UniProtKB/Swiss-Prot annotation:
Keywords: Endoplasmic reticulum, Glycoprotein, Glycosyltransferase, Magnesium, Manganese, Membrane, Metal-binding, Transferase, Transmembrane, Transmembrane helix. This is Dolichyl-diphosphooligosaccharide--protein glycosyltransferase subunit STT3A. Its main location: endoplasmic reticulum. It is found in: Endoplasmic reticulum membrane. A motif (DK motif) lies at residues 592-599. A motif (DXD motif 1) lies at residues 47-49. Its cofactor is Mg(2+); Mn(2+). PANTHER family: DOLICHYL-DIPHOSPHOOLIGOSACCHARIDE--PROTEIN GLYCOSYLTRANSFERASE SUBUNIT, DOLICHYL-DIPHOSPHOOLIGOSACCHARIDE--PROTEIN GLYCOSYLTRANSFERASE SUBUNIT STT3A. Mn(2+) binds at residues 49, 167, 169. Its EC number is 2.4.99.18. Pfam families: AglB_core-like (PF22627), STT3 (PF02516).
């Protein structure tokens, strides 16, 4: 089409083409901005959980769904093992395997690893499109395009969707927004068609991420608010009843979910609102058949009876255990101190910590300030759909403050409401912008408005443009510097500004894979379990699934005990090798010494570890120190000795004594010691990973060789 031909198109067609072009550019930007890690390093899986997801996806692609669904993994949680098919959300793996097989059907040969690496950026592009349609339903196409452009680069979402971040959240945010879009369409139309599509989107969400619980509580809450505000109608009744019935039946097809939608407390709100819908419909029917006096007497009687019966039945079901109580993670959302005081394994995960104020600006920047503007617009122009987005924004704001991981749930609604806010500000001032030539304006036109209306409008538009540009630069910088570094490969800047690569993790796992027996059992802290099984292909005792607190506690007890007591535990668990992460030489702060207090807390949280007390590992003044002032219990435990073995002879910095720990900024207190029950098997180039072999007893069990 020539340029002249384009200009001859009708205004509507030009408008459509321009929207399509902008939306396509946002989708391409969303994909490309997540590729920093691939360009800087290589096509590699990030973090810890993604390695398990990659391993299971590879098994599914090679062996098929039947074997995948019935897979018993004997490489994990030795000697217990783990049933894979019934303990995971399979949506991520099935999606990747389906894409892999479709590409191979068309003779596009691509490794399953590369499918996994690029899946999250691909779905982030789909998310921009869904965000556009969702925001368009709330305001207009202009707001939708702004929201799509914002979510394409928002760091709060990019943090879990960069190339290589192969985790459930990579596709779950798309599923969540798709479900919300279908729900709003169902609410607006009252159509079973849209409600059924919403149920299907919800089913995809359930199959992909445990965060579906937020969704199945938010939608009923929306319906309840519509009831309380007098907005409940036949449209809402049809939409919710269809979504709840179909969605519940479909969600129960996921093995890991099973009967939870009708048995667990997290799902009871949805069931209760479903019952309220039936009562509301019945009351409306009675109102149409009875006079006001009869209706009031009957209404009070029925409500009292139904309320009493429901409370009695609910209490009995809770007491008899037919309805399971809330899980620890759910309790920790309602009471942030619950996990810290009762379940240290949950509190030990960095993702479960409360969010700091600085994190909001770091992950959202401009959106923090434009979110209230969009919220104000929705309050000023209330509708059923806008009530939903208000509730989504307010609830996700609270939950993101309780748990930093849920910043991911907040980011999309921040983009939507900020897109609405920016669109409203720009459209308001654009109306005041007069682009006609000054010499052609009549004196009457000039005097009819305040003198500087045009200048104020121009200034505000320039200010908003500046804010949007700074938002883009900030998001790109955060993506590049903070969220595009795979934890499996570390990097740092040298004195001359060049990039230094630390590839110790893969070096260690490669050594394990090729230099240890295939049936070797490796003991490490649970953080590294998935990586060891995926990359070293060796049996591990605990991993990131953390389903058995007692087993993890036993590992923590071994790490926190003296060599003799630890040896008894290691022999009990048939351990062949022990792996620890140590950052004292390179300055890597996420090492096992810094995680050690969590090992102590978790180790002492069970009956077999009651003798382990956290205060024993502190100095008399309450400090955790690794130097000569440190606690003797700490300086003689297994973890300390494995990390600092031979370290007392190493010079780490100029003008510092040997054995100077660059993370703790201290000279270690216990330098001259030998290991009795372990022998050093391998230490990586930068001492980041240290592997020890457990010595065997001699034939009579009198000494170790």
């Amino acid at each position: 089409m020539t340029k002249l031909g384009f200009l001859r198109l009708s205004y509507e067609k030009q408008d459509t083409l321009l929207k399509l072009l902008i939306l396509s550019m946002a989708a391409v930007l969303s994909f490309s901005t997540r590729l920093f890690a691939v360009l800087r390093f290589e096509s590699v899986i990030h973090e810890f959980d993604p390695y398990f997801n990659y391993r299971t996806t590879r098994f599914l692609a090679e062996e098929g769904f039947y074997k995948f669904h019935n897979w018993f993994d004997d490489r994990a949680w030795y000697p217990l093992g783990r049933i894979i098919g019934g303990t995971i959300y399979p949506g991520l793996m099935i999606t990747s395997a389906a894409i892999y097989h479709v590409l191979h059907f068309f003779h596009i040969t691509i490794d399953i690893r590369n499918v996994c690496v690029f899946l999250a950026p691909l779905f982030s592009s789909f998310t921009t499109i869904v965000t556009y349609h969702l925001t368009k339903e709330l305001k207009d196409a202009g707001a939708g395009l702004l929201a799509a452009a914002m979510i394409a680069v928002v760091p709060g979402y990019i943090s879990r969707s960069v190339a290589g971040s192969y985790d459930n959240e990579g596709i779950a945010i798309f599923c969540m927004l798709l479900t919300y879009y279908m729900w709003i369409k169902a609410v607006k139309t009252g159509s079973i068609y849209w409600a059924a599509k919403c149920a299907l989107a919800y089913f995809y969400m359930v199959s992909s991420w445990g965060g579906y619980v937020f969704l199945i509580n938010l939608i009923p809450l929306h319906v309840l608010v519509l009831m309380l505000t007098g907005r409940f109608s036949h449209r809402i009744y049809v939409a919710y009843c269809t979504v709840y019935c179909l969605g519940t039946i479909l969600s129960m097809q996921i093995s890991f979910v099973g009967f939870q939608p009708v048995l667990s407390s997290e799902h009871m709100a949805a069931f209760g609102v479903f019952g309220l819908c039936q009562i509301h419909a019945f009351v409306d029917y009675l109102r149409s058949k009875l006079n006001p006096q009869q209706f009031e007497v009957l209404f009070r009687s029925v409500i009292s009876l139904v309320g009493f019966v429901l409370l009695t039945v609910g209490a009995l079901l809770m007491l008899t255990g037919k309805i399971s109580p809330w899980t620890g993670r759910f309790y920790s959302l309602l009471d942030p101190s619950y996990a810290k005081n009762n379940i240290p394994i949950i509190a030990s995960v960095s993702e479960h910590q409360p969010t700091t104020w600085s994190s909001y600006y770091f992950d959202l920047q401009l959106l923090v300030f434009m979110f209230p503007v969009g919220l104000y617009y929705c309050f000023s122009n209330l509708s059923d759909a806008r009530i939903f987005i208000i509730m989504y924004g307010v609830t996700s704001m609270y939950f993101s403050a309780v748990m930093v991981r849920l910043m991911l749930v907040l980011a999309p609604v921040m983009c939507i409401l900020s897109g609405i806010g920016v669109s409203q500000v720009l459209s308001t001032y654009m109306k005041n912008l007069d682009i006609s030539r000054p010499d052609k304006k009549s004196k009457k036109q000039q005097d009819s408005t305040y003198p500087i209306k045009n200048e104020v409008a121009s200034g505000m538009i320039l200010v908003m443009a500046f804010f949007l540009i700074t938002y883009t630069f900030h998001s790109t910088w955060v993506t590049s510097e903070a969220y595009s570094s795979p934890s499996i490969v570390l990097s740092a800047r040298g004195g001359d500004g060049s990039r230094i690569i630390f590839d110790d993790f893969r070096e260690a796992y490669y050594w394990l894979r090729h230099n240890t027996p295939e049936d070797a059992k490796v003991m490490s802290w649970w953080d590294y379990g998935y990586q060891i099984t995926a990359m070293a292909n060796r049996t591990i005792l605990v991993d990131n699934n953390t389903w058995n607190n007692t087993h993890i506690s036993r590992v923590g007890q071994a790490m926190a005990s003296t060599e003799e007591k630890a040896y008894e535990i290691m022999r009990e668990l048939d351990v062949s090798y022990v792996l620890v992460i140590f950052g004292g030489l390179t300055g890597y702060s996420s090492d096992d010494i810094n995680k050690f207090l969590w090992m102590v807390r978790i180790g002492g949280s069970t009956d077999t570890g009651k003798h382990i007390k956290e205060h024993d590992y502190y100095t008399p003044t309450g400090e955790f120190r690794v130097d000569r002032e440190g606690s003797p219990v700490l300086l003689n435990c297994l973890m300390y000795k494995m990390c600092y073995y031979r370290f007392g002879q190493v010079y780490t910095e100029a003008k510092r004594p040997p054995g100077f720990d660059r993370v703790r900024n201290a000279e270690i207190g216990n330098k001259d010691f030998e290991l009795d029950v372990l022998e050093e098997a391998y230490t990586t180039e930068h001492w980041l990973v240290r592997i020890y072999k457990v010595k065997d007893l001699d034939n009579r069990g009198l000494s170790r060789t």
